[in-house]
Amino acid sequence: MAYFPVNINIENKKCFVIGGGTVAKRKANMLLDFGADVTVVAEELKQDFEGCKVLKKPFEYDDIKSAFFVVASTDNKKLNSEIAQYCRENNIYVNSVTNADDCTFTLSSYIRQGDVVISVNTSGKSPALSKYLREYIEKIIPSNLSELLDNINGIRQNIYEKYGGNARHIFRKLIDYGFKNQGKLPVG
């Protein structure tokens, strides 16, 4: 089943990562990149979880009662499935790194330049393909999308007021120009 692509604001939301290894670290960093309040629960930490709250202890369901969402990223597939089942039963969004069928959401591979976020998702079927596509896209897009977005946003209201129904065509021309000119827009 394909997952519906949606972008949500997770700034200051309580997000829990269960597990202390490399995959847990990568997932925690993704969440931190978007301002989440990340708590890592693990009996053993194999990584440094800078920026996260850390509960160095065995996982208990009480740990995640206040969670907006949970990432089950232990090296124990059975435990990840049990965590996912608990989350589903308690209406907590959950991602399991060991079984896509346990997930109520997936974490996309993404490119971020300021407020420009481009994500690639394979509905949990092939994270390797998602990564490959992300790396491919990174090679073909300009490195100044954030600047272009800021410039477009700065004139957006004026364009709508001046051009009304033709604004979409004007934006297309401005974006084409910005792609060719390092994010800069024509003056005037």
Task: State where each predicted segment sits.
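Residue-level detector of alpha-helix initiation sites
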Residues: 21-23, 78, 124
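ADP-ribose/adenylate-binding Rossmann-like module
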Residues: 69-73, 80-106
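An accessory alpha-helical subdomain
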Residues: 124-188
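Glycine-rich, highly charged phosphate/nucleotide-binding loops
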Residues: 49-65
